[in-house]
């Protein structure tokens, strides 16, 4: 990233063909998954009229992703990573075809939606873990921070486009079109990924997978700095689970099917802006304090979201949450890489991703339960302000993270 500019440096896409292939595959994949992300909750809401059932689907998928991340970490360290990536992507596509066929039935099966969500969550996370493990070999460790920011921008831009497309498809063709195009897009991603070089795992002594994972957990618990970062990440993803209330809130705001897509696109849009303007974030003298404050601001935005009288104002609150959460997430990623020992980087990154998934699943379950007892407006506000109170307490408790200082990197002539 260029220190002299707020904007992200995209030069890696020009200088590293393998990373460019991953960039293209990831963008297509995110668009495909976005179509799926709109269709599943809307279909379940239409079938059951229950926010609890919508939350349950997200929780089950999140649980499967957590298991997949743990298993995927072991596979990525023992088998050729390119094969793991291709196998995981292809298997996900099969699950999407199943969702499409189920949606075409006269009476779609709710159980099938849940089971296929487990299938896709598990195999999708296998590919994510293998790709994370292979990234240093594709871009070099000196470029990992830049690659991480480009990856976030890719994910967010794809997440902005796909919900709006998904909303239009729902309004015109129904959920089967969303599932079918998601399957097609997933199989298309295999084409650029086939061009990747062989990605063998590094030579290392055999160790029982559970023993290796336990060592990572012990490090998280023993380090107030890294452990605090992971805790903030989990709470932030809990807040993002507010999306399970979108269908119910859309009814409250009397939104059309096409307008629902704007709710799903708002957070990724704000996060994309945050990633695109992240050029100077790495040079913050007090990244821990900035991380804590941006997280508190994100919680406040969610608390205000449900109170908005018009849906367009709710979209603004969601976009603000996306921007603040992107700032916090990029600081989390940077500090984890710099404060974690080299021998622990793989496990800590895997556990960080897994706890983000877990936070999302827990948040979805809690919001689904609140939605069954309270109005959607009250549920959204209670979750945001409740997390804000927890965040203020953490601001006081996480002293080492709050006081952490770093020396800003020197300006380079090339700016890269």
UniProtKB/Swiss-Prot annotation:
Transmembrane segments: 22-42, 56-76, 84-104, 110-130, 157-177, 179-199, 219-239, 257-277, 288-307, 314-336, 357-377, 379-399
Gene3D superfamilies noted in UniProt: MFS general substrate transporter like domains
Matches recorded under InterPro entries: Enterobactin_exp_EntS, MFS_dom, MFS_trans_sf, TM_effector
UniProt subcellular location: Cell inner membrane
A Gene Ontology cellular-component term: plasma membrane
GO MF entries: enterobactin transmembrane transporter activity
Membrane topology annotation: Multi-pass membrane protein
Cytoplasmic compartment spans: 1-21, 77-83, 131-156, 200-218, 278-287, 337-356, 400-416
Keywords, in A-Z order: Cell inner membrane, Cell membrane, Membrane, Transmembrane, Transmembrane helix, Transport
Taxonomic superkingdom: Bacteria
Pfam families: MFS_3
PROSITE patterns per the UniProt record, alphabetical: MFS
Periplasmic-facing ranges: 43-55, 105-109, 178, 240-256, 308-313, 378
Biological role stated in the UniProt entry: Component of an export pathway for enterobactin.
Family of this protein: Belongs to the major facilitator superfamily. EntS (TC 2.A.1.38) family.
Name used for this protein in its record: Enterobactin exporter EntS
């Amino acid at each position: 990233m260029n220190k002299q500019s707020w904007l992200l440096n995209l030069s890696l896409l020009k200088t590293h063909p393998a990373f460019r292939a991953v960039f293209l595959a990831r963008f297509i994949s995110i668009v495909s998954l976005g179509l799926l992300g709109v269709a599943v909750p809307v279909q379940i809401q239409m079938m059951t009229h229950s926010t609890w059932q919508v939350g349950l689907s997200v929780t089950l998928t999140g649980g499967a992703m957590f298991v997949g991340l743990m298993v995927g970490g072991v596979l990525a360290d023992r088998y050729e990573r390119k094969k793991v990536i291709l196998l995981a992507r292809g298997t996900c596509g099969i699950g999407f075809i199943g969702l499409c066929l189920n949606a075409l039935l006269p009476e779609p099966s709710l159980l099938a939606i849940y089971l296929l969500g487990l299938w896709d969550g598990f195999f999708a996370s296998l590919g994510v873990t293998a790709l994370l493990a292979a990234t240093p070999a594709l871009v070099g460790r000196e470029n990992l921070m830049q690659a991480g920011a480009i990856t976030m921008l890719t994910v967010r831009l794809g997440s902005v486009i796909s919900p709006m497309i998904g909303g239009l498809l729902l309004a015109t063709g129904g959920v089967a079109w969303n599932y079918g195009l998601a399957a097609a897009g997933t199989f298309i991603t295999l084409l650029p990924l086939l061009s990747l070089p062989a990605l063998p795992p590094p030579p290392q002594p055999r160790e029982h997978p559970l023993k290796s994972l336990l060592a990572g957990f012990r490090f998280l618990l023993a380090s107030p700095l890294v452990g605090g970062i992971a805790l903030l990440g989990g709470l932030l993803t809990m807040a993002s689970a507010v999306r399970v209330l979108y269908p119910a809130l859309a009814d409250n705001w009397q939104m059309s099917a096409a307008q629902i897509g704007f709710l799903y696109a708002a957070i990724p849009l704000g996060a994309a802006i945050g990633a695109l303007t992240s050029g100077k974030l790495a040079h913050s003298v007090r990244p821990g304090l900035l991380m804590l404050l941006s997280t508190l601001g994100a919680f406040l935005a969610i608390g205000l979201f449900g109170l908005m009288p018009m849906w367009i104002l709710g979209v603004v609150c969601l976009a603000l949450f996306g921007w603040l959460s992107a700032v916090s997430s990029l600081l989390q990623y940077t500090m984890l890489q710099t404060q974690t020992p080299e021998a622990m980087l793989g496990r800590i990154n895997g556990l960080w991703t897994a706890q983000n998934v877990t936070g999302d699943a827990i948040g979805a379950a809690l919001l689904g339960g609140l939605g069954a007892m309270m109005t959607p407006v009250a549920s959204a506000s209670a979750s945001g302000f409740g997390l804000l109170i927890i965040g203020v307490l953490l601001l006081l408790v996480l002293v080492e993270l709050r006081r952490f200082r770093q020396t800003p990197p020197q300006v380079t002539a090339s700016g890269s």
